[in-house]
A protein has these predicted regions:
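Periplasmic solute-binding protein
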Residues: 115-131, 263-272
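C-terminal lobe and pocket-closing loops
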Residues: 226-284, 320-321, 328, 332
Length: 336
């Protein structure tokens, strides 16, 4: 009987397929989306794709322009494999089918890696407008309801609208819709469009993401004096919690007009994959990034100051890992 059980167990082991070995140099094919046709996000994606192509010669890893919000839809519906600009905003809204998504996408995409966690939302106002309306803080805006021309992104770019400014407004007792009720208006577009509007006196307030110490913000401030909208860190944290972000303080001197620390929303940005993407493709993309840390950092921007292999498995939204990514992280002890 004992020998029969041993033989049966051995036969079962033979029958089970062994896990494929992905530790080879065979090429992979993938399309990465989520970045606009120009600017840093595209530079980031093109740089990461180049690392993968060099690690696995012959790979066809390409870039497909889109937006952060649109990128998640693309991978969920199988029109692209990865999106490289997702945050907690896109993850939650897509899972739940909230605007700008028309239906829940839960289960159609999964987590691959954190790319960086230092995307800071800039809450700026012109000194001229602030002085004219007696505004120093979010609380002042809530109580005085001033007419403002607000430069902000479009709501179909959720992370820099729904994911931060809208939530901070809610935390202080008003909403994005109140801006028009107070006699104000919007300049909708990316951060470059918004800063141009400040320079051209077409906007009074700017809410969007830029790197800390951004040269363009400094240049704008030299032409039209700026101030940071002050606030209470605990209240900002309440807003940040909605999408698994955190409140952080912008250090004194980050910009010439900052005489003290100011609170803001600090966001993380992640690479996601569609559920249709083979484990091998995801595993190899992850491995290429992890084992070429210095080269990834050399792409510049947020990757230079925040990307590390040790933090790739950090998953603030607790989105299920793609099996290919999870396999690599378990092999390296980054996930239990």
């Amino acid at each position: 009987m004992y020998f029969a059980r041993v033989l049966a167990a051995a036969a079962l082991l033979v029958a089970l397929p062994a896990a494929a070995d992905f530790n080879d140099k065979k090429p992979i094919n993938a399309t990465v989306t989520g970045a606009t046709p120009s600017g840093y996000p595209r530079t980031m994606v093109e740089g990461m794709n180049a690392v993968v192509r060099d690690t696995y010669p012959g790979s066809a890893v390409s870039f497909k322009p889109n937006s952060p919000g649109g990128g998640v839809l693309e991978i969920a519906e199988g029109r692209a494999d990865f999106t490289a600009t997702a945050t907690g905003t896109e993850v939650r809204l897509a899972n739940e089918g909230q605007s700008p998504y028309s239906k829940p996408l839960k289960g159609k995409f999964s987590y691959v890696m954190q790319l960086y966690d230092n995307q800071f939302i800039h809450f700026l106002m012109t000194k001229e407008w602030a002085d004219a309306n007696g505004i120093k803080s979010w609380a002042d805006i809530a109580s005085k309801k001033p007419r403002m021309r607000l430069a902000i992104n479009r709501p179909d770019n959720p992370q820099t609208t729904i994911g931060a400014p809208y939530e901070v407004m809610k935390a202080y007792g008003f909403s994005i819709n109140d801006i028009e009720k107070w006699g104000g208006s919007y300049v909708l577009g990316n951060s470059s469009i918004g800063l141009d509007a400040i320079v051209d006196d077409k906007a009074d307030v700017f809410m969007n993401a830029r790197n800390l110490g951004d040269a363009l913000v400094k240049d704008v401030a030299s032409k039209r004096p700026l101030l940071w909208i002050d606030g209470d860190r605990a209240t900002i944290q309440k807003a940040a919690d909605a999408f698994n972000f955190k409140a952080d303080m912008v250090p004194v001197g980050t910009y010439p007009f900052m005489e003290k620390e100011y609170p803001t929303v600090r966001q993380w940005v992640a690479l996601l994959a569609g559920s249709h993407v083979p484990d091998e493709v995801v595993y190899k993309y992850v491995k290429a990034m992890a084992e070429n840390e210095k080269r990834v950092q050399a792409i510049g921007g947020s990757l230079k100051t925040s990307f590390t292999a040790a933090k790739m498995a950090v998953n603030p939204a607790n989105l299920p890992y793609h099996p290919g990514a999870l396999r690599y992280y378990k092999e390296k002890g980054l996930v239990k």
